[in-house]
Amino acid sequence: QQLVMASAKALGAPRYTRASTLFLELKDSYVSRKASELQVVESFRKPTLLILDEFQERGETDFEQRTLTAIIDLRYGDQTDTLIIANQTKERFYESAGESIADRLRETGGIIECTWPSFRDRQTDPDAGELTGGCQ
């Protein structure tokens, strides 16, 4: 336990957030003035590992695209790890993420597509069989 705590202190803790929460934090900075937009962006730049979940749930507006591209590009330049989770096919992800983000992810580790059925569906259907599919 002490080793884990020391590692987290030395390396910095990972940060998990949903993509939509990232934009809620940015929008809150305009109203609450607790932090500037730059400070919010920096808070997503700093972690040694940033995990963005539910990537497909964002609005895909120009503002969101530019902001995500800026964050991913800053992290790319800093050589820090970013994991994006999206319930999308690889093709749809490329389309929604845009070339810049997709290229950065391919260059720094790749994109893994998992083809098994939704686990959420299994929770509502107790008679569902085994999960089939895999990751490539």
Task: Give residue spans per PLM region.
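Walker A/P-loop nucleotide-binding motif
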Residues: 1
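The start of beta-strands in P-loop NTPase/AAA+ ATPase cores
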Residues: 13, 48-49
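Active-site loop/turn elements of alpha/beta-hydrolase fold enzymes
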Residues: 19
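Short basic/glycine-enriched coil/helix segment immediately N-terminal to the Walker B
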Residues: 39-48
